[in-house]
Amino acid sequence: MSRHLVEQINKYVGENDILFHLGDWSFSGIENIWNFRKQLKVKEIHLLIGNHDHFIKRNRVLPNVYRTEPYSQNLADGKPIGGEYPDYVEAKTLFTSVHDYLDVEIDNILVPLIHYPMENWNDRFGKAYHLHGHTHGMLPVKEFRLDVGMDNAFILFGEYRPFSWEEIKTMLDDKK
C-alpha cells in the first residue's frame, strides 16, 4: 500500500506544489518515515502531527538511518544538515515544517489545519475551511469542515490520492 500511496502523491502533486499532510505519516519504523519522504517528488511538505506520528511528536528529531553512508542533504530544501554522518536530525530536515495545528490562508480563505476534526475553529462563522484527517471518511462534510485523508478520497473519488485545492473549494462552497 505504501508504494501505491507514493505513486498517487507523485501523480497528483507536482515537484513545485505544496503538500499539507494532515497526520499519520508513518505507522511503522524510523526507516519508513525516511523512505516514504525520500520517494516523494514534492519539495515542500508541511506535516500536521497525527495520532500515529508518535516518534516525530515525542522527539521532533529522528535517528539518521543513513548515517553509515554519505547522506547529508536536507530532503525539504536540499541544504546540508550539518556534518556528513549525524546521528540525529531534526524532523524539519524531512519536512518544510512540523505542527500540531496550523492556520494558512489560500485564495483569501483562512484554512485551519489539524489532524483531528473540530466542532469550532478559527473564523468558523466567517468562511474558514477546516481541513482534517483522522476519521477515515466516517464524518460527512459539514459546513466548512472536510476530512482530506486519502481514505476519504477513496470514498469520494474511488482512488487513494490527495485532494486538490480546487476540489476542496468546490465541495465546501456547495455547503454554504
Give residue spans per PLM region:
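Conserved beta-sheet core of the metallophosphoesterase superfamily
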Residues: 64-176
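Core catalytic region of metal-dependent phosphoesterases/phosphodiesterases
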Residues: 1-101
